[in-house]
């Protein structure tokens, strides 16, 4: 199945060279990463020794953090340049991460049905709003999750607040992201995400909102999911 938006891929191909620059195009992800790693570790009861799949891994910011926490990480993405950056950075960091250029739908087809081929933890961060068919991604994640595994999705709510903060604020005013990184109509309401998860036989255990203070450059979590949010599912 071709669940790819080439325009979206091209955006991230162009930004690949700055992926690991903490003050570059991915500065917001670098700032957010410690918070989301801590959340994932807490809800997954630690990552050490666990088999983890990072879907839409890009240049590997979260993949590396999870590997440093002791996880056995596989990262998949359909971009070329960001994956090259991810492989090089992991090697320079002395980390072993299995990066593969594939869609998750094709990855599922190449896995066997046995329990050993499935994952304890699956992460899909800031990716669902960049694909034509989010449900297909969710169903594929479910197929790869162990019965006692934990799955995490993060995305952006389709609200006026999110439009003002993520597009106008982050892209045009603060210039933290390149203009055109996000398209408002592709943002996903929590009810839509939960409906797709229900169709995939996944149950939401918790949902939290990400929030950012541009003065302190700090992120925090609370129950307000009107902008960026993360969901934990089983």
UniProtKB/Swiss-Prot annotation:
Gene3D superfamilies: Vaccinia Virus protein VP39
UniProt keywords, alphabetically: Methyltransferase, S-adenosyl-L-methionine, Transferase, Ubiquinone biosynthesis
One GO BP: methylation
Pathway given in the UniProt record: Cofactor biosynthesis; ubiquinone biosynthesis
Known EC number: 2.1.1.222, 2.1.1.64
Keyword Cell membrane found: no
Pfam families noted in UniProt: Methyltransf_23 (PF13489)
Family statement: Belongs to the methyltransferase superfamily. UbiG/COQ3 family.
PANTHER family, per the entry: METHYLTRANSFERASE, UBIQUINONE BIOSYNTHESIS O-METHYLTRANSFERASE, MITOCHONDRIAL
Protein name: Ubiquinone biosynthesis O-methyltransferase
The organism of origin for this protein: Actinobacillus pleuropneumoniae serotype 7 (strain AP76)
């Amino acid at each position: 199945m071709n669940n790819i938006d080439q325009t979206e891929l091209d955006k991230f191909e162009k930004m690949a060279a700055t992926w690991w620059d903490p003050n570059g195009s991915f500065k917001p992800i670098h700032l957010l990463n410690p918070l989301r790693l801590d959340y994932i570790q807490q809800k997954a009861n630690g990552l050490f020794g666990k088999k983890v799949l990072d879907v839409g891994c890009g240049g590997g910011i979260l993949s590396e953090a999870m590997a440093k926490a002791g996880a056995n990480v596989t990262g998949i993405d359909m971009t070329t340049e960001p994956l090259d950056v991810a492989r090089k950075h992991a090697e320079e960091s002395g980390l072993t991460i299995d990066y593969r250029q594939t869609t998750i739908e094709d990855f599922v087809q190449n896995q066997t049905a046995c329990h050993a081929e499935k994952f304890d933890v699956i992460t899909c961060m800031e990716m669902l709003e960049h694909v034509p068919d989010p449900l297909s991604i969710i169903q594929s994640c479910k197929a790869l999750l162990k019965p006692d595994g934990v799955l995490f999705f993060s995305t952006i709510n389709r609200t006026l607040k999110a439009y003002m903060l993520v597009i106008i604020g982050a892209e045009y005013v603060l210039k933290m992201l390149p203009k055109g990184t996000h398209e408002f109509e592709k943002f996903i309401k929590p009810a839509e995400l939960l409906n797709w998860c229900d169709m995939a036989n996944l149950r939401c255990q918790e949902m939290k909102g990400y929030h950012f203070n541009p003065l302190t450059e700090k992120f925090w979590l609370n129950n307000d999911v009107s902008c960026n949010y993360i969901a934990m599912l089983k």
